[in-house]
Amino acid sequence: MSAFGCSSMTFHGHTEQRAFGGCRNTGGALSRFAILAGCWLGLICTKSWGAEVTAAHPSAEHIEFFENKIRPVLTQHCYSCHSAEATKLKGGLRLDSRAGLLKGGDTGPAIVPGQPDASLLIQAVRYKDEDTAMPPKKPLPEALVADLEAWVRMGSPWPETEKTGSPARVETQGFDWAKFRSEHWAFRNVVTSEPPTVKNTSWVSHPIDQFVLARLQSAGLTPAPPAEKRVLIRRAYLDLTGLPPTPEAVTTFLADPSPDSFAKVVDALLASPQYGEHWGRHWLDVARYSDGLGGFLDSEELPEAWRYRDWVVGALNRDLPYDQFVRAQIAGDLLSNDRDLAIATGFFAVGPTYISDGGDPEATAQARAETLADRVDTFSRTFLGLTVACARCHDHKFDPITARDYYALAGIFDNSKVELTSIAPREVVNAFDAAQKAIKDHEKLIKATGTNTAAKSQEAPLKAELERLKKAVPAAYAKAHLLVDRGNKDMPVAIRGDLRKPGEPAPRRFLQIVAGENPPLFRDGSGRRQLADAVTDPANALTVRVIVNRVWQHHFGQALVRTPSNFGMLGEKPTHPELLDWLASTFMENGWSLKKLHRLILLSSTWQMSSQYRAESFAKDGENRLLWRMNPRKLEVESWRDSMLAVTGELDRALGGPPSDRILESSRRTLYGKVSRNGDRFLSDEFLRLFDFPAPRSTSEQRTASTVPRQHLFMMNSGFMAARAQALSARLQRESSDDQTRITRAYQLLYARPPVADETALGLAFLAETTTGTTASRWDSYAQALLSAHEFIQNQ
């Protein structure tokens, strides 16, 4: 297929794009370019959270949202008057079941699933009508109202425990721990299996291939042929660095006949600093990294958050073993006096810290509860693949996680606080503070001279000395947002999640399902250091399975466990459980090295398959769960923008530093754009969110890949795209002397291949047409079409 992916369609006119949104119909040869790569009009569709969800089959994602965001609100603010436990049921309304919400009370159904504006519950919490406003004493925080609106919009999913199929839940006696550990795959020990014997041994170049091929053969499927070398090198560059290869790199690879030619490419990419930037961004998604400004009750800017981002990039580039990578983010400030390790606690410190709305006890408790819920949720889903925050109000409805487990972990974070503090050497801080004190002392002396004539005579030399002191002040020392210990107390279980209602004590410790029936208690400070030890203990199978699954996901577009942050009962089972465990055990044997894991995967025949579509294979495995081909993937917004800057020759490859609010005007990688918690505070937010960047209000395990009209309008009409097209056109004019050579160069830069004859002829015909503006404007339009092509936006 050509770069435009649209050879069978004919259009009878075109739209020439201008730099700032103007359009004019010009007709002619550019008609085949106007829809720009991929037949935009045919691809336009929308993707939503899924208002189609039904009560009978809520997804794991929706249930997590309900348990983390909705049940705590209903429990704390509604159940005292509207549940089975209410002394007197008010308004005939029960809110402790979906059926109760749908039935409603005296005024009708409380919710209309999928329609928040038509739902009485939403109208009440919006506080627009004082006669129906709820809760009666004061409105809910805006963030909680937004959560309720989102929940109704997605169809009001509500988990029904009697339908869970949980094999070991006994309501009256707690959990059958042994049964869970023996029957649920995620809680079993990692077992290293021998790679299975397969028939087509010629395809196998790696143990990974044996596991994959065995599943394919059992289903009557065969693997796709190998990808062409040009496709392979472009895939490797995009997978490992988020940038395309240069034509020179492609030529060198094609000319290298040695059997390890591709291994050399992989090793070079893993050694490049761009590797850490690209994979650091993947990690920042799960770490819900932002530069602050989350809105109501979470409105603080985090001016030094970028230091955590840079720490992640640096740690990945130097291949810090993953167990140490995890330990540093949980307790880096406690592991050594190295302030660099302390920066790693930004994993928690740059998350939301809610403040009290008004300072009353209820608001203070709510803010504290929401902050702790974020810490526990982000920690457990990121490192363990478990939704521990679902046990905030009660024992987990599906997984072997008790409310005591939740508050044991919450107590650890309740004994830790966020500080913006120095990471500079003590002598640097002392010198700066001494200089500032000297300035203040001189300012006081000047002020003390008053109007006395004799004293006034001393003012001039004092002012001169003050100016000298100001010029001599050393640069402000570096600071970072850190998590530090502040106490050593256990928390009680909060009755129904309300911190004002303490229940039984919950000593700080690790999860019972992992640590055993009598887990050791954490008594060392907050307990974070002991928590870090427990999480990275090789006996804990969750941590290692979760990370190898995440790495696999980013290389194939789908994970072996398709719910990467939920390995519990509602999560999906692995498609290749033996392969998952083989990867996990090999990963640990290789010293928890992420770079070795990447290399392992990329050198397999499985990863090197083409993305060739075959109808017979699709009929048997339409979702490609068994991996009969490589999944073609749309580039994430960072890779797409960065790739444009790379091929136009504009990319600034400098590493690290403070973020830019105006990322569309910058030549730096998109990683260095400012990101707000709600995705609506900085200029860079709108662009990023348009192309599926997740709002970092909570951990994000996988991005959506939408195709919506506004994206195509941006490609056609934005000043950013026009500027990139002009830059590419200018580069081609500089580097080549005639149009045919320029067209060839453009295809090599963008797609890592030369154009086929039809593509060259099409380009030459358009460029030669004198009725469509100047030569320069035709080249700009042609370049914009190539940059917007399906082939450029996709990783094959």
Which residues make up each language-model segment?
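Bacterial N-terminal signal peptides
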Residues: 32-47
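Conserved phosphate-binding loops in nucleotide/dinucleotide-binding enzymes
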Residues: 106-112, 697-703, 767
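N-terminal secretory signal peptides that target proteins for export/translocation
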Residues: 1-30
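Helix-loop-helix junctions that connect adjacent transmembrane helices in secondary transporters/permeases
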Residues: 513, 518, 758-771
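Sequence/structural segment immediately N-terminal to covalent heme-attachment motifs in c-type
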Residues: 65-79, 144-151, 375-391, 409, ...
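An acidic, gly/pro-interrupted, aromatic-rich
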Residues: 122-126, 207-216, 287, 315-317, ...
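Aromatic- and Gly/Pro-enriched helix-to-coil junctions and flexible linker segments
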Residues: 47-333, 396, 416-546, 550-561, ...
